[in-house]
UniProtKB/Swiss-Prot annotation:
Other comment: This protein is the product of two different mRNAs spliced from the same primary transcript.
Record keyword Ligase present: no
Function: Plays a major role to prevent cellular inhibition of viral genome replication by nuclear bodies. Assembles an SCF-like E3 ubiquitin ligase complex based on the cellular proteins ELOB, ELOC, CUL5 and RBX1, in cooperation with viral E1B-55K. This viral RING-type ligase ubiquitinates cellular substrates prior to proteasomal degradation: p53/TP53, LIG4, MRE11-RAD50-NBS1 (MRN) complex, ITGA3, DAXX and BLM.
Keyword Membrane annotated: no
Location(s), subcellular: Host nucleus; Host cytoplasm
InterPro entries: Adenovirus_E4_30/34
Organism ancestry: Viruses, Varidnaviria, Bamfordvirae, Preplasmiviricota, Tectiliviricetes
The family this protein is said to belong to: Belongs to the adenoviridae E4 30 to 34 kDa protein family.
Protein name: Probable early E4 33 kDa protein
Length: 289
């Protein structure tokens, strides 16, 4: 996984990340189609690697980069291209044990089998198709279980408010960065300086900045993962400096840059124990540090 910066490494120094800019506005408009009253379509088990997203309560799916043109057309006809199709309703219990489930919802305006109407069978059929598509995407979170060091290195020099959460590997590498409300709004205002391939996904539960990497090799190798996480660390540091009104990616004091954000280091230890030994994570400790 090379972040698409390997063939054009000079773009990294401009904060540019990786996708055709001509498709950006069209992509966001197609994905933002959560209209109508939602209703539950089914439940999906949560993989072990998705525990960090369970803590956030929601996981956006960039459909235009995940699906091919035919699948995207079919799901669009079925009103299935909601940007946040799954939420974790069991994410507010005291402990996260790995037995959580994701709720899959639809915006077709019907209540599935609870309401008889002209679109009832279509909704039920769409639910089965959508379950397969979303479950495959959720399985891509196993990347976080296989490469726990990725988060450690990516968040090494970042402050609270702009942190890498996890990745989804499903044909492409989808990188999820969580931003607090104020930081999220400021980053949107700096969108022109962040570069290409940066998607902003906002819901009531969380705010994500999603980076889509199109040229990472499949399957990933250890060397590619190491290179990818170094470039992400560089990018996050540059974004942080932009928010602080500084240019470049240099530390605040030249020659002196130590790891910070103790809350994030505590979360990393809890995630490591969960991935290795399935040790339950106490929610309040994880969220508050």
């Amino acid at each position: 996984m090379t972040f698409c910066l390997l063939p054009a490494f000079t773009q990294a120094f401009c904060g540019c990340i990786f996708i055709n800019p001509l498709t950006m506005s069209a992509t966001l408009s197609r994905m933002d189609c959560c209209v109508g009253l939602p209703h539950c379509m089914g439940w999906l088990p949560s993989p072990v690697g998705a525990v960090a997203f369970v803590m956030e309560g929601a996981l956006p799916i960039p459909w235009s980069y995940y699906l091919n043109s035919y699948d995207k057309h079919v799901l669009q006809q079925l009103d299935c291209l909601c940007l946040f199709p799954v939420t974790c309703y069991q994410s507010f219990t005291s402990y996260v044990t790995g037995d959580e489930v994701w709720s899959l919802h639809c915006h077709c305006g019907r209540q599935g089998s609870l309401q008889v109407g002209p679109r009832r069978l279509q909704c039920l059929a769409a639910a089965k198709v959508r379950e397969l598509v979303v479950q495959k995407f959720l399985l891509g979170t196993r990347f976080n279980e296989y490469y726990p060091q990725y988060r450690v290195h990516a968040n090494r020099y970042v402050n609270p408010g702009l942190e890498y959460v996890g990745s989804v590997w499903c044909g492409k590498h989808f990188i999820y960065v969580r931003a607090d409300g104020a930081e999220f709004a400021r980053l949107k205002g700096l969108r022109a300086r962040l570069g290409q391939g940066v998607l902003f996904c906002e819901s009531l539960l969380s705010c994500y900045v999603v980076i889509v990497c199109q040229q990472c090799a499949c399957p990933p190798t250890d060397a590619q993962v190491d290179h990818c996480m170094r470039l992400l660390s560089f990018t996050l540091r540059r974004w942080q400096n932009l928010l602080l009104g500084r240019s470049g990616s240099s530390p605040l004091i030249p020659g002196f840059d130590i790891p910070r954000n103790r809350t994030e280091r505590l979360r990393q230890r809890m995630l490591h124990r969960f991935y290795s030994y399935r040790t339950p994570i106490y929610r309040l400790t994880y969220l508050r540090g």
